[in-house]
């Protein structure tokens, strides 16, 4: 029989830099999960993606064991890296803070496709384009 899931914890952590300090320790500790085991496993899985924030979804079972799924980095992080900017515009209507090309947009859409609620690259590109526009990043040909 399958184990019963007690809790699902969602965190966004730096790739390869999870440690027992907050926010990881308290979030996992209250469910009785072995914090160091999670940190070691997460760091091992994400060490090749250094510099990105990687969202993780941790399923905690009755017997205090756990499994986790790593997601793709947030679109905003991928867009800021591609545009070479520190952060998006405070007010996107006031003007552009940077720009990315269509090919960069397609690359980001391909990366994000498994986590987006769409099936084609074209629709994924539209979703990412909307995110970029809201951040004050313009799309160039």
Curated annotation (Swiss-Prot):
Keywords assigned by UniProt, alphabetized: Methylation, Ribonucleoprotein, Ribosomal protein, RNA-binding, rRNA-binding
Keyword Manganese: no
CDD domains cross-referenced by the UniProt entry: Ribosomal_L11
InterPro entries listed in its UniProt record: Ribosomal_uL11, Ribosomal_uL11_bac-typ, Ribosomal_uL11_C, Ribosomal_uL11_C_sf, Ribosomal_uL11_CS, Ribosomal_uL11_N, Ribosomal_uL11_N_sf
PTM statement from Swiss-Prot or TrEMBL: One or more lysine residues are methylated.
GO biological process: translation
TM annotation in the entry: none
Cellular component, GO annotation: cytosolic large ribosomal subunit
MF terms (GO), sorted A to Z: large ribosomal subunit rRNA binding; structural constituent of ribosome
Short name of any one Pfam family annotated for the protein: Ribosomal_L11_N
Function: Forms part of the ribosomal stalk which helps the ribosome interact with GTP-bound translation factors.
Oligomeric form and interacting partners: Part of the ribosomal stalk of the 50S ribosomal subunit. Interacts with L10 and the large rRNA to form the base of the stalk. L10 forms an elongated spine to which L12 dimers bind in a sequential fashion forming a multimeric L10(L12)X complex.
UniProt similarity note: Belongs to the universal ribosomal protein uL11 family.
Name of the molecule in the record: Large ribosomal subunit protein uL11
Organism: Prochlorococcus marinus subsp. pastoris (strain CCMP1986 / NIES-2087 / MED4)
